[in-house]
Amino acid sequence: MSNVPADLKYASSHEWVRADGDGVYSVGITEHAQELLGDMVFVDLPEVGSEVSAGSDCAVAESVKAASDIYAPISGEIIAVNAELESSPELVNSAPYTDGWLFSIKASDESELDSLLDAEAYLATIEE
């Protein structure tokens, strides 16, 4: 059973979003996603300052099993990336909701959050 924190919003493509305040959101992949991928060996993150659109691929997680695109759950500007992942990509496995975050985004349209799933709805999609 995957851990799905109730205070986050989720995309059906297995990204999570956490409000950090002032229209800034942290993004990562869910515990379920990292379990499917297996041990991370590399994470290719978006460039700080780049603009992303909701649903567009903006990063890649490479594991011992596969490479998987990571999609922007909301539109906006990438304002930070988790530099720790360069030397420690395994943080995505060991702490997907905390130290294994991927990037921070300054939302250009916070109403897009309304189309994301809450924990209960996300759990329902992964238990199908």
From Swiss-Prot:
GO biological process, one term: glycine decarboxylation via glycine cleavage system
Alphabetized UniProt keyword annotations: Lipoyl
Gene Ontology CC: one annotated term: glycine cleavage complex
Pfam families on file: GCV_H (PF01597)
Residue(s) carrying N6-lipoyllysine: K65
Cofactor details (free text): Binds 1 lipoyl cofactor covalently.
Cofactor(s) annotated in UniProt: (R)-lipoate
Alphabetized PROSITE patterns for the sequence: BIOTINYL_LIPOYL (PS50968), LIPOYL (PS00189)
Subunit structure: The glycine cleavage system is composed of four proteins: P, T, L and H.
Family classification: Belongs to the GcvH family.
Function: The glycine cleavage system catalyzes the degradation of glycine. The H protein shuttles the methylamine group of glycine from the P protein to the T protein.
Name this protein carries in UniProt: Glycine cleavage system H protein
Native organism: Yersinia enterocolitica serotype O:8 / biotype 1B (strain NCTC 13174 / 8081)
This protein's encoding gene: gcvH
